[in-house]
């Protein structure tokens, strides 16, 4: 099974979310279902239907989190080199198409946040820059149009 590469912070968030589901949300939804059953006929019971739908969504999220927690690798545990771009690296790149410099951090898919310039290794840009060295020019292959970037500096 594939591993999820996540940060320690994201791991802690997932553990807290799972704990809240198991200790707070699941008992609450179980109580809602019990109360709805006591109302009688379940065939036309909107409260029961809503609670069942919420329970299904909660179970799906619980299963997703458990899958991640059973198959993760911490970013901090991945061997990093300052000679080449790897997960956790912060780099300055120059995008030739946009005539624009930017600083990005390469992260696992669970930690990506494009608005904070945290780019997943699984994106076209992430795949293009990983294992590259300072000064490398790479082509980023996207569905729309490929473009070139230069790795100006590996900051961290």
Curated annotation (Swiss-Prot):
The keyword Metal-binding is assigned to this record: no
Any one GO molecular-function label of the UniProt entry: RNA polymerase binding
Keywords of this entry: Coiled coil, DNA-binding, Transcription, Transcription regulation
Highest rank taxon of the organism: Bacteria
Keyword Transcription regulation: yes
Coiled-coil spans in chain: 1-84
GO terms under biological process: DNA-templated transcription elongation; regulation of DNA-templated transcription elongation
InterPro entries, alphabetized: GreA/GreB_C_sf, TF_GreA/GreB_CS, Tscrpt_elong_fac_GreA, Tscrpt_elong_fac_GreA/B, Tscrpt_elong_fac_GreA/B_C, Tscrpt_elong_fac_GreA/B_fam, Tscrpt_elong_fac_GreA/B_N, Tscrpt_elong_fac_GreA/B_N_sf
SUPFAM superfamilies linked: FKBP-like, GreA transcript cleavage protein, N-terminal domain
PROSITE patterns: GREAB_1 (PS00829)
Pfam family, one: GreA_GreB_N
Family: Belongs to the GreA/GreB family.
NCBIfam families: greA, PRK00226.1-4
Annotated function: Necessary for efficient RNA polymerase transcription elongation past template-encoded arresting sites. The arresting sites in DNA have the property of trapping a certain fraction of elongating RNA polymerases that pass through, resulting in locked ternary complexes. Cleavage of the nascent transcript by cleavage factors such as GreA or GreB allows the resumption of elongation from the new 3'terminus. GreA releases sequences of 2 to 3 nucleotides.
UniProt-recorded name of the protein: Transcription elongation factor GreA
Name of the encoding gene: greA
């Amino acid at each position: 099974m594939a591993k999820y590469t996540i940060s320690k912070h994201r791991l802690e968030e997932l553990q807290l979310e799972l704990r809240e589901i198991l200790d707070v949300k699941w008992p609450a939804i179980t109580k809602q279902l019990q109360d709805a059953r006591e109302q009688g006929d379940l065939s036309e019971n909107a409260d029961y239907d809503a609670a069942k739908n919420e329970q299904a969504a909660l179970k799906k999220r619980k299963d997703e989190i458990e899958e991640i927690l059973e198959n993760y690798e911490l970013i901090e545990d991945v061997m990093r080199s300052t000679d080449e771009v790897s997960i956790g690296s912060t780099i300055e790149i120059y995008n030739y198409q946009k005539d624009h410099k930017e600083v990005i951090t390469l992260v696992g898919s669970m930690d990506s946040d494009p608005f904070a310039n945290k780019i997943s290794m699984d994106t076209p840009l992430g795949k293009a820059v990983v294992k590259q060295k300072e000064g490398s020019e790479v082509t980023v292959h996207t569905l729309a149009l490929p473009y070139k970037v230069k790795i100006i500096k590996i900051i961290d």
